[in-house]
Regions:
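Accessory, solvent-exposed terminal regions and/or long lumenal/extracellular loops of proteins
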Residues: 1-174
Length: 174
């Protein structure tokens, strides 16, 4: 996927002038920003009749935070190894993972809870963010773990879901 950040360009001029470079999207993992790893899903690709096992990675424009594309690697049967790339229109802003992370940080209820957890002898850590295409849009799902200072095993405390401009969080997805 790192090679694709440069080699997705089809026009010679755009390629040589590096006008459309991409980055693999970033997220907050634990408490620090890092490049996202690919996620594995069982998912119905658009136009396909049955769900299949896919590997997915999101891209943002170089040094920007909005999402520009998602690459999916197919892993089932005759489709094994085929790559499918969904590019978002340049005239439509699709929030990238770090923009969603910022929305989470700006949510007063969530921020209050994070503060409380950090001051009571425990620390919260964000897990891997999942990016799920839904109805021509993107839904983000991120688990939040609570880790006691004397315990090595973190506990899932909340699940945050973001869709469009809306953010919800609860102890489960139910």
């Amino acid at each position: 996927s790192n090679a694709y950040t440069k080699y997705h360009m089809n026009e010679v001029k755009v390629f040589y002038q590096k006008e459309d470079m991409w980055d693999v999207a970033h997220q907050i993992y634990g408490t620090k920003e890092k490049q996202m790893s690919s996620s594995f899903f069982i998912f119905n690709l658009p136009g396909e009749k049955k769900a299949e096992f896919i590997n997915m990675i999101p891209f943002t424009p170089k040094s920007k935070q909005n999402m520009t594309a998602i690459m999916m690697a197919r892993n089932d049967g005759d489709e094994y190894g085929k790559l499918v790339v969904y590019k978002f229109p340049k005239n439509k802003t699709v929030y990238g993972p770090m923009q969603v992370e910022a929305q989470i940080d700006q949510n007063s209820e969530i921020a209050k809870e994070f503060s409380l957890w950090n001051s009571s002898g425990t620390t919260y850590k964000r897990g891997d963010m999942f990016i799920i295409p839904v109805n021509n849009s993107i839904m983000y799902v991120e688990p939040v773990y609570l880790e006691a200072s004397n315990q090595a095993i973190p506990e899932v405390k909340r699940v945050i879901v973001a869709y469009g401009d809306k953010i919800a969080y609860a102890s489960t997805l139910d």
